[in-house]
Amino acid sequence: MHLHLNHKDLLPEKRRLIENLRLREDVLANKTILVVDDDVRNLFALTTAFERHNIKAITAESGQEAINILGENLNVDMVLMDIMMPEMDGYETTQKIRREHKNSNLPIIAVTAKAMKGDREKCIEAGASDYITKPVKIDQLLSLMRVWLYK
């Protein structure tokens, strides 16, 4: 994981929004994030980083487990969805969440190693709110999360 953020990669309006957010109380504090990934190393890395920012993480190692958690827990503020998972991949899981979950505005960020042309669009078409590639840069992920949780 890389721990730096390149502001040049952001659109000017998102850059201004993030700079304003950093001046205020952190919108990530006390938020509940569902992290869906079949690789426990990724789950560990993200949950460890989230602890430092007072973010509560709930983990799921499969798409079906994520759907079950969302069915039981209406207090999830955001989902980070790995795309490449066995059985039910992130595309199918995202589509099911969009069809079945009570909060249709729930931000879902696709987290994937797929960085080829068209991969971002495929994630958005499946129902993801946004997209970030692996290896995840924690500061960049946190900034993206702030943008979606601030809305």
Predicted feature residues:
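C-terminal catalytic ATP-binding subdomain
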Residues: 1-24, 47-55, 64-67, 72-73, ...
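Receiver (REC) domain active-site loop signature in two-component systems and cognate sites
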Residues: 85
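A Lys-centered signature of the CheY-like receiver
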Residues: 134
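Active-site beta3 strand of CheY-like receiver
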Residues: 74-81
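Conserved acidic segment of CheY-like receiver
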Residues: 30-40, 46-50, 79
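Helix N-cap/capping motif at the beta->alpha junctions
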Residues: 38, 59-68, 90
